[in-house]
Amino acid sequence: MKNYILLLLLAGQTAVAAAQDGDSRSLYLTRSLANDAITSAVVRTSAGGIVVSGQAGQAPRVEVYIKGNNGNELSKEEIKKRLDKDYTLDISVTGHEVKAIAKSKRQSFFNWRSSLSISFRIYVPQQCSTDLETSGGGIGLDNLKGNEKFSTSGGGLQIDRLNGVIRGNTSGGGIYVSNSGDDISLETSGGGIEAKNCNGKIRLETSGGGITLENLKGTINAETSGGGVNGNNITGELITSTSGGSIDLKRMAASVSAETSGGGLYAQMLKVGKYLKLQSSAGNVDIELPQNQGYDLDLRGEGVSPSSVAKFNGQWEKERVNGKYNGGGIPVKAEASGGSVNIKFR
Protein backbone atom coordinates (compact mmCIF):
# COMPACT_ATOMS: atom_id res chain seq x y z
CA MET A 1 0.00 0.00 0.00
CA LYS A 2 2.66 2.53 0.96
CA ASN A 3 4.68 1.84 -2.20
CA TYR A 4 1.53 2.26 -4.30
CA ILE A 5 0.70 5.61 -2.73
CA LEU A 6 4.32 6.75 -3.09
CA LEU A 7 4.21 6.09 -6.83
CA LEU A 8 1.02 8.11 -7.15
CA LEU A 9 2.56 11.01 -5.27
CA LEU A 10 5.81 11.08 -7.22
CA ALA A 11 4.40 12.74 -10.31
CA GLY A 12 2.86 15.54 -8.28
CA GLN A 13 5.88 16.07 -6.08
CA THR A 14 8.16 16.12 -9.12
CA ALA A 15 6.02 18.87 -10.60
CA VAL A 16 6.24 20.89 -7.40
CA ALA A 17 10.00 20.40 -7.39
CA ALA A 18 10.18 22.14 -10.76
CA ALA A 19 9.29 25.38 -9.00
CA GLN A 20 11.36 24.51 -5.94
CA ASP A 21 14.62 23.43 -7.53
CA GLY A 22 16.18 26.87 -7.18
CA ASP A 23 18.02 26.30 -10.46
CA SER A 24 19.81 29.64 -10.97
CA ARG A 25 20.16 28.88 -14.67
CA SER A 26 16.40 29.40 -15.13
CA LEU A 27 16.08 32.40 -12.76
CA TYR A 28 14.90 35.20 -15.04
CA LEU A 29 14.26 38.05 -12.60
CA THR A 30 13.86 38.94 -8.92
CA ARG A 31 11.53 41.61 -7.54
CA SER A 32 12.10 42.75 -3.93
CA LEU A 33 9.13 43.02 -1.55
CA ALA A 34 11.20 44.23 1.40
CA ASN A 35 9.32 47.51 1.85
CA ASP A 36 5.79 46.29 1.08
CA ALA A 37 4.67 44.42 4.27
CA ILE A 38 2.88 41.82 2.16
CA THR A 39 -0.21 40.14 3.68
CA SER A 40 -1.70 38.63 0.51
CA ALA A 41 -0.32 36.94 -2.63
CA VAL A 42 -2.23 36.34 -5.86
CA VAL A 43 -0.48 34.24 -8.51
CA ARG A 44 -1.57 33.00 -11.94
CA THR A 45 0.52 31.08 -14.46
CA SER A 46 0.27 28.31 -17.05
CA ALA A 47 2.63 25.37 -17.55
CA GLY A 48 4.64 26.43 -14.53
CA GLY A 49 4.87 25.83 -10.80
CA ILE A 50 4.16 28.10 -7.84
CA VAL A 51 5.84 28.16 -4.44
CA VAL A 52 4.92 30.58 -1.64
CA SER A 53 7.02 30.46 1.53
CA GLY A 54 6.85 32.28 4.85
CA GLN A 55 10.13 30.79 5.99
CA ALA A 56 11.95 32.95 8.53
CA GLY A 57 15.25 34.48 7.48
CA GLN A 58 14.34 34.96 3.82
CA ALA A 59 14.16 38.44 2.31
CA PRO A 60 10.63 39.06 0.94
CA ARG A 61 10.78 38.82 -2.84
CA VAL A 62 9.36 37.36 -6.04
CA GLU A 63 11.56 35.09 -8.14
CA VAL A 64 10.54 34.24 -11.70
CA TYR A 65 11.94 31.08 -13.30
CA ILE A 66 11.51 30.63 -17.04
CA LYS A 67 12.44 27.72 -19.28
CA GLY A 68 11.37 26.45 -22.66
CA ASN A 69 8.20 24.39 -22.33
CA ASN A 70 10.20 21.31 -23.31
CA GLY A 71 12.58 21.94 -20.38
CA ASN A 72 15.34 23.49 -22.46
CA GLU A 73 17.45 26.28 -20.99
CA LEU A 74 17.13 29.53 -22.91
CA SER A 75 19.20 32.70 -22.96
CA LYS A 76 17.65 35.79 -21.37
CA GLU A 77 17.60 37.38 -24.79
CA GLU A 78 15.57 34.51 -26.24
CA ILE A 79 13.23 34.51 -23.22
CA LYS A 80 12.62 38.25 -23.57
CA LYS A 81 11.92 37.85 -27.26
CA ARG A 82 9.32 35.14 -26.63
CA LEU A 83 7.80 37.03 -23.68
CA ASP A 84 7.39 40.22 -25.69
CA LYS A 85 5.79 38.34 -28.56
CA ASP A 86 3.50 35.84 -26.85
CA TYR A 87 3.10 36.58 -23.11
CA THR A 88 2.14 39.11 -20.50
CA LEU A 89 4.28 38.99 -17.35
CA ASP A 90 3.22 41.38 -14.61
CA ILE A 91 4.35 41.73 -11.00
CA SER A 92 2.65 44.46 -9.01
CA VAL A 93 1.92 45.50 -5.42
CA THR A 94 -1.29 47.25 -4.41
CA GLY A 95 -1.65 48.05 -0.75
CA HIS A 96 -0.15 44.99 0.91
CA GLU A 97 -1.09 42.53 -1.85
CA VAL A 98 1.39 41.23 -4.40
CA LYS A 99 0.15 39.97 -7.75
CA ALA A 100 2.30 37.84 -10.06
CA ILE A 101 0.55 37.08 -13.34
CA ALA A 102 1.89 35.24 -16.38
CA LYS A 103 -0.45 34.56 -19.29
CA SER A 104 -0.45 34.09 -23.02
CA LYS A 105 -1.40 37.00 -25.26
CA ARG A 106 -3.00 34.54 -27.66
CA GLN A 107 -6.46 33.06 -27.14
CA SER A 108 -5.88 30.21 -29.58
CA PHE A 109 -3.20 27.52 -29.64
CA PHE A 110 0.25 28.60 -30.77
CA ASN A 111 3.45 26.74 -31.55
CA TRP A 112 4.41 24.72 -28.47
CA ARG A 113 8.04 24.80 -29.56
CA SER A 114 8.18 28.51 -28.76
CA SER A 115 6.07 28.31 -25.58
CA LEU A 116 7.49 28.96 -22.11
CA SER A 117 7.22 27.42 -18.67
CA ILE A 118 6.92 30.34 -16.21
CA SER A 119 7.22 29.48 -12.53
CA PHE A 120 7.08 31.70 -9.44
CA ARG A 121 8.76 31.39 -6.07
CA ILE A 122 7.57 34.03 -3.60
CA TYR A 123 8.93 34.73 -0.12
CA VAL A 124 6.50 36.56 2.17
CA PRO A 125 5.94 37.20 5.89
CA GLN A 126 4.41 34.23 7.71
CA GLN A 127 1.08 36.02 8.21
CA CYS A 128 -0.01 35.91 4.58
CA SER A 129 -3.05 34.68 2.64
CA THR A 130 -2.79 33.26 -0.87
CA ASP A 131 -4.85 32.79 -4.05
CA LEU A 132 -2.89 30.61 -6.47
CA GLU A 133 -3.73 29.02 -9.84
CA THR A 134 -1.66 27.19 -12.43
CA SER A 135 -2.70 25.03 -15.37
CA GLY A 136 -0.05 22.39 -15.45
CA GLY A 137 2.53 22.79 -12.71
CA GLY A 138 2.84 21.93 -9.06
CA ILE A 139 2.08 24.13 -6.06
CA GLY A 140 4.03 24.27 -2.81
CA LEU A 141 3.28 26.28 0.35
CA ASP A 142 5.09 26.40 3.68
CA ASN A 143 5.21 28.38 6.92
CA LEU A 144 2.05 30.44 6.37
CA LYS A 145 -0.85 31.59 8.54
CA GLY A 146 -4.04 32.82 6.88
CA ASN A 147 -6.59 31.86 4.24
CA GLU A 148 -4.84 29.76 1.61
CA LYS A 149 -6.61 28.94 -1.67
CA PHE A 150 -4.82 27.14 -4.48
CA SER A 151 -5.50 24.92 -7.49
CA THR A 152 -3.69 23.26 -10.37
CA SER A 153 -4.96 21.25 -13.32
CA GLY A 154 -2.13 18.79 -13.60
CA GLY A 155 0.52 18.99 -10.92
CA GLY A 156 0.95 18.03 -7.29
CA LEU A 157 0.33 19.89 -4.04
CA GLN A 158 2.98 19.98 -1.32
CA ILE A 159 1.97 21.70 1.92
CA ASP A 160 3.90 22.08 5.17
CA ARG A 161 3.34 24.18 8.30
CA LEU A 162 0.19 26.00 7.27
CA ASN A 163 -2.40 27.23 9.77
CA GLY A 164 -5.75 28.73 8.86
CA VAL A 165 -8.43 28.01 6.27
CA ILE A 166 -6.73 25.84 3.65
CA ARG A 167 -8.48 24.97 0.37
CA GLY A 168 -6.58 23.18 -2.39
CA ASN A 169 -7.31 20.94 -5.36
CA THR A 170 -5.55 19.31 -8.27
CA SER A 171 -6.92 17.37 -11.22
CA GLY A 172 -4.14 14.92 -11.74
CA GLY A 173 -1.37 14.97 -9.17
CA GLY A 174 -0.68 13.78 -5.66
CA ILE A 175 -1.11 15.68 -2.39
CA TYR A 176 1.26 15.75 0.58
CA VAL A 177 0.32 17.78 3.66
CA SER A 178 2.18 17.88 6.97
CA ASN A 179 2.40 19.86 10.23
CA SER A 180 -0.69 21.90 9.37
CA GLY A 181 -4.00 22.67 11.00
CA ASP A 182 -7.23 24.51 11.74
CA ASP A 183 -9.46 23.92 8.67
CA ILE A 184 -8.06 21.83 5.81
CA SER A 185 -9.85 20.71 2.63
CA LEU A 186 -7.80 19.09 -0.14
CA GLU A 187 -8.93 17.21 -3.23
CA THR A 188 -7.36 15.40 -6.18
CA SER A 189 -8.93 13.54 -9.09
CA GLY A 190 -6.14 11.17 -9.89
CA GLY A 191 -3.37 10.90 -7.34
CA GLY A 192 -2.68 9.73 -3.82
CA ILE A 193 -2.94 11.72 -0.59
CA GLU A 194 -0.61 11.61 2.40
CA ALA A 195 -1.37 13.61 5.56
CA LYS A 196 0.93 13.65 8.59
CA ASN A 197 1.06 15.55 11.90
CA CYS A 198 -2.04 17.66 11.25
CA ASN A 199 -4.90 18.81 13.47
CA GLY A 200 -8.32 20.43 13.29
CA LYS A 201 -11.04 19.91 10.72
CA ILE A 202 -9.55 17.89 7.86
CA ARG A 203 -11.27 16.79 4.63
CA LEU A 204 -9.34 14.74 2.06
CA GLU A 205 -10.74 13.32 -1.16
CA THR A 206 -9.27 11.47 -4.14
CA SER A 207 -10.96 9.69 -7.02
CA GLY A 208 -8.10 7.50 -8.06
CA GLY A 209 -5.40 6.91 -5.48
CA GLY A 210 -4.73 5.74 -1.96
CA ILE A 211 -4.79 7.70 1.29
CA THR A 212 -2.27 7.58 4.13
CA LEU A 213 -3.12 9.24 7.47
CA GLU A 214 -0.61 9.49 10.30
CA ASN A 215 -0.57 11.37 13.61
CA LEU A 216 -3.78 13.32 13.07
CA LYS A 217 -5.99 14.95 15.69
CA GLY A 218 -9.43 16.41 15.12
CA THR A 219 -12.36 15.68 12.82
CA ILE A 220 -11.08 13.84 9.76
CA ASN A 221 -13.06 12.89 6.67
CA ALA A 222 -11.04 10.90 4.10
CA GLU A 223 -12.57 9.40 0.97
CA THR A 224 -11.17 7.58 -2.05
CA SER A 225 -12.88 5.81 -4.93
CA GLY A 226 -9.94 3.86 -6.20
CA GLY A 227 -7.34 2.98 -3.58
CA GLY A 228 -6.82 1.83 -0.04
CA VAL A 229 -6.76 3.76 3.24
CA ASN A 230 -3.98 3.44 5.82
CA GLY A 231 -4.38 5.20 9.16
CA ASN A 232 -2.10 5.32 12.20
CA ASN A 233 -2.38 7.17 15.51
CA ILE A 234 -5.55 9.19 15.02
CA THR A 235 -7.38 11.01 17.82
CA GLY A 236 -10.84 12.57 17.62
CA GLU A 237 -13.19 11.41 14.85
CA LEU A 238 -12.43 9.60 11.60
CA ILE A 239 -14.93 9.05 8.80
CA THR A 240 -13.40 7.20 5.87
CA SER A 241 -14.51 5.16 2.88
CA THR A 242 -13.13 3.51 -0.24
CA SER A 243 -14.74 1.74 -3.17
CA GLY A 244 -11.63 0.04 -4.42
CA GLY A 245 -9.25 -1.07 -1.70
CA SER A 246 -8.75 -2.22 1.85
CA ILE A 247 -8.75 -0.15 5.05
CA ASP A 248 -6.04 -0.59 7.68
CA LEU A 249 -6.38 1.46 10.88
CA LYS A 250 -3.90 1.21 13.76
CA ARG A 251 -3.60 2.90 17.15
CA MET A 252 -6.96 4.63 16.94
CA ALA A 253 -8.28 6.67 19.87
CA ALA A 254 -11.34 8.05 18.17
CA SER A 255 -14.90 7.71 17.02
CA VAL A 256 -14.60 5.81 13.74
CA SER A 257 -16.82 5.15 10.73
CA ALA A 258 -15.05 3.12 8.03
CA GLU A 259 -16.52 1.50 4.94
CA THR A 260 -15.02 -0.39 2.01
CA SER A 261 -16.58 -2.13 -0.97
CA GLY A 262 -13.35 -3.50 -2.35
CA GLY A 263 -11.33 -5.20 0.37
CA GLY A 264 -10.94 -6.13 4.00
CA LEU A 265 -11.01 -3.85 7.02
CA TYR A 266 -8.79 -3.87 10.11
CA ALA A 267 -9.26 -1.55 13.08
CA GLN A 268 -7.00 -1.53 16.14
CA MET A 269 -8.64 0.64 18.78
CA LEU A 270 -6.65 1.99 21.71
CA LYS A 271 -9.78 3.83 22.84
CA VAL A 272 -13.22 3.93 21.28
CA GLY A 273 -14.85 7.37 21.20
CA LYS A 274 -18.59 7.90 20.90
CA TYR A 275 -19.10 5.13 18.34
CA LEU A 276 -17.45 2.54 16.10
CA LYS A 277 -18.99 1.58 12.77
CA LEU A 278 -17.17 -0.74 10.36
CA GLN A 279 -18.45 -2.21 7.10
CA SER A 280 -16.93 -4.32 4.32
CA SER A 281 -18.79 -5.80 1.36
CA ALA A 282 -15.84 -7.74 -0.04
CA GLY A 283 -13.70 -9.02 2.82
CA ASN A 284 -13.29 -9.66 6.52
CA VAL A 285 -13.66 -7.13 9.31
CA ASP A 286 -11.02 -7.56 12.02
CA ILE A 287 -11.37 -5.55 15.23
CA GLU A 288 -9.24 -5.13 18.34
CA LEU A 289 -11.00 -3.39 21.25
CA PRO A 290 -9.78 -2.35 24.71
CA GLN A 291 -11.39 -4.62 27.29
CA ASN A 292 -11.82 -1.88 29.90
CA GLN A 293 -14.64 -0.12 28.00
CA GLY A 294 -18.29 -1.15 27.76
CA TYR A 295 -19.91 -1.76 24.37
CA ASP A 296 -23.28 -2.41 22.78
CA LEU A 297 -22.24 -4.94 20.13
CA ASP A 298 -23.99 -5.43 16.79
CA LEU A 299 -21.89 -7.76 14.62
CA ARG A 300 -22.94 -9.46 11.38
CA GLY A 301 -21.07 -11.56 8.84
CA GLU A 302 -20.76 -14.91 7.14
CA GLY A 303 -19.17 -15.88 10.43
CA VAL A 304 -18.32 -14.27 13.78
CA SER A 305 -15.18 -15.26 15.67
CA PRO A 306 -14.63 -16.27 18.44
CA SER A 307 -17.72 -18.32 19.28
CA SER A 308 -18.10 -16.58 22.66
CA VAL A 309 -16.38 -14.14 25.05
CA ALA A 310 -16.47 -13.47 28.77
CA LYS A 311 -18.34 -10.45 30.21
CA PHE A 312 -20.93 -10.62 27.40
CA ASN A 313 -24.69 -10.66 27.86
CA GLY A 314 -26.95 -11.16 24.86
CA GLN A 315 -27.25 -13.09 21.61
CA TRP A 316 -24.04 -14.66 20.25
CA GLU A 317 -24.63 -16.80 17.18
CA LYS A 318 -22.53 -18.06 14.30
CA GLU A 319 -23.38 -15.15 11.97
CA ARG A 320 -24.83 -12.57 14.36
CA VAL A 321 -23.91 -10.99 17.70
CA ASN A 322 -26.19 -8.56 19.50
CA GLY A 323 -25.72 -7.67 23.16
CA LYS A 324 -23.65 -5.93 25.81
CA TYR A 325 -20.00 -6.38 26.63
CA ASN A 326 -18.72 -5.26 30.01
CA GLY A 327 -22.12 -3.82 30.92
CA GLY A 328 -22.69 -2.07 27.58
CA GLY A 329 -22.24 1.54 26.56
CA ILE A 330 -20.53 2.59 23.31
CA PRO A 331 -22.28 1.38 20.14
CA VAL A 332 -20.02 -0.90 18.10
CA LYS A 333 -21.41 -2.04 14.77
CA ALA A 334 -19.50 -4.22 12.31
CA GLU A 335 -20.76 -5.86 9.15
CA ALA A 336 -18.94 -8.11 6.67
CA SER A 337 -21.30 -9.02 3.84
CA GLY A 338 -18.56 -10.86 1.99
CA GLY A 339 -16.52 -12.29 4.86
CA SER A 340 -16.27 -12.81 8.60
CA VAL A 341 -16.17 -10.50 11.59
CA ASN A 342 -13.26 -11.30 13.90
CA ILE A 343 -13.11 -9.50 17.24
CA LYS A 344 -10.53 -9.43 20.03
CA PHE A 345 -10.58 -7.72 23.42
CA ARG A 346 -7.20 -6.66 24.84
Language-model-derived ranges and their functions:
Residues 1-346:
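Intrinsically disordered, low-complexity terminal regions
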